[in-house]
Regions:
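Asp-box/BNR beta-propeller blade signature and adjacent active/binding-site loops
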Residues: 1-137
């Protein structure tokens, strides 16, 4: 999954596409991720796990959790290769801008982010996300 970015106001949704063959071919057209609405801001995407058998893979996205401001840092999860983002966890309630994500041993997730402005960095480690989407059996 490639995050094409956000063209800026008035559009607030991230655009995504699938790239295959080592990055040489676009496998799909672009689509908007309805759940990833936010003020124009760099976010981070990281693969937490690959699909295996009947178990879905998990993509993570970190960015502002609100549409109107760089605030409420939120980690989101997609279990269908970026089509939907049903799982989310807020990691910081205040000002939260650019971020990066890293999957740690055991599945926990580290997030480094701009905290309360561009002069401060925040860092947090979150528990491993659920292996299945919310409501799955």
């Amino acid at each position: 999954v490639l995050f094409v970015g956000n063209p800026g106001p008035p559009e607030t949704r991230r655009r995504l596409t699938i790239i295959t063959e080592g990055g040489t071919r676009t496998a799909t057209g672009m689509w908007h991720a309805e759940e990833l609405k936010h003020a124009s801001c760099q976010g981070a995407v990281e693969r937490h796990s690959w699909p295996e058998g009947d178990k879905p893979g998990l993509l993570l996205y970190s960015g502002p959790g609100v549409e109107a401001a760089r605030a409420q840092g939120t980690l989101r999860g997609s279990y269908d290769e970026g089509k939907t983002w049903p799982w989310k966890q807020t990691y910081y309630e205040g000002g939260s801008g650019y971020s990066d994500v890293c999957v740690l041993p055991g599945g926990r997730v580290a997030v480094l982010f701009e905290q309360d402005g561009k002069s401060n960095l925040g860092f947090t480690v979150l528990p491993a996300p659920p292996p299945q989407p919310p409501g799955a059996k």
